[in-house]
Amino acid sequence: MFYPVIKKALFQLDPERAHELTFQQLRRITNTPFEFLVRQSVPTKPVTCMGLSFKNPLGLAAGLDKDGECIDALGAMGFGFIEVGTVTPRPQSGNDKPRLFRVVEAEGLINRMGFNNKGVDSLVENVKKTRFGGVLGINIGKNKDTPVEQGKDDYLICMDKVYAHAGYIAINISSPNTPGLRSLQYGEALDDLLLAIKNKQAELKERHQKYVPVAVKIAPDLSEEELIQIADSLVRHNIDGVIATNTTLDRKLIQGLNHCGQTGGLSGRPLQTSSTEIIRRLSQELAGRLPIIGVGGIDSLVAAREKMAAGASLVQIYSGFIFHGPRLIKDIVTHI
């Protein structure tokens, strides 16, 4: 109800400053009786995916709550699941500012944040305090200064630390803002990483006596051949799910608009069609062998339904949430 007024004020500010101010307020009310200020009631729409029970199929995508500081306040808005992160083994400040830009006319965002986060240990401490009743995903990545050849070690360190606290673990190999990261999506590098992750998952299952599914997050900027190879690798290594997609480097839909020349990943409405097409092609290739979590430009109920019609079992929002607020959650969950 109040979001249009709040949004108008926030959109006068630098995007990252607006984010910081919003999270400052959410941190203040999280785990307090004042959570009622953001709480909204949504119907239960149970979904089973990756062996987990979701109270509804709508989640918050990774990147908004990188350090898991506002899980309960965000959960109160009605998300069926929340994905925190991307988190890395060691804290890192990310890329130089400014690094987040609004493409207002297109309801898009461009970011080159660079995995800024307080490190996996800090995230785990925050996760331990949460009372969120939905599924919690933890998205993990590699530190910028870790050579790509040793990148898998960073994922294994993070897995070791988050496993006991995660509903599922998301492997981010598709951010365009960490040099060389996307190369892990291809060929031997991908097979090597997935083998190491599955071995670690088996080891941690024995140690903790519980199975935590692993999903891999992929880019939208993939050729037909690359997509076929990725699908084949995911199936061969028995990965539990795939998150499609991350942000795009493509700018054709925002040519001539403010900030269109900024480097970084583009999200929001300009990503909607291409991410849905990747989901459709991926769904055909996977033929039901593993589930797809659809994300990219969902800004309405219709956009969410399109992702599910293309083959997604669950969907996530981020940019659409920034532009439309908590009402978008209620609209999607109520009518999906």
From Swiss-Prot:
From the UniProt record, list the reaction(s) this protein catalyses.
(S)-dihydroorotate + a quinone = orotate + a quinol
**Keywords assigned:** Cell membrane, Flavoprotein, FMN, Membrane, Oxidoreductase, Pyrimidine biosynthesis
Q: Which InterPro entries match?
A: Aldolase_TIM (IPR013785), DHO_dehydrogenase (IPR050074), Dihydroorotate_DH_1_2 (IPR012135), Dihydroorotate_DH_2 (IPR005719), Dihydroorotate_DH_cat (IPR005720), Dihydroorotate_DH_CS (IPR001295)
User: Subcellular location, in the record's words?
Assistant: Cell membrane
Annotated cofactor note = Binds 1 FMN per subunit.
Which CDD domains is this protein grouped with?
Answer: DHOD_2_like
Q: Where is the active site?
A: S175
Enzyme class (EC, first level): oxidoreductase
Question: One Pfam family, short name please?
Answer: DHO_dh
Keyword Metal-binding in annotation = no
> GO BP, one example?
'de novo' UMP biosynthetic process
Annotated family: Belongs to the dihydroorotate dehydrogenase family. Type 2 subfamily.
Per the entry, what this protein does is: Catalyzes the conversion of dihydroorotate to orotate with quinone as electron acceptor.
Kindly provide the name given to this protein in its UniProt entry.
Dihydroorotate dehydrogenase (quinone)
Q: Which organism is it from?
A: Pectobacterium carotovorum subsp. carotovorum (strain PC1)
Lineage, please? Bacteria, Pseudomonadati, Pseudomonadota, Gammaproteobacteria, Enterobacterales
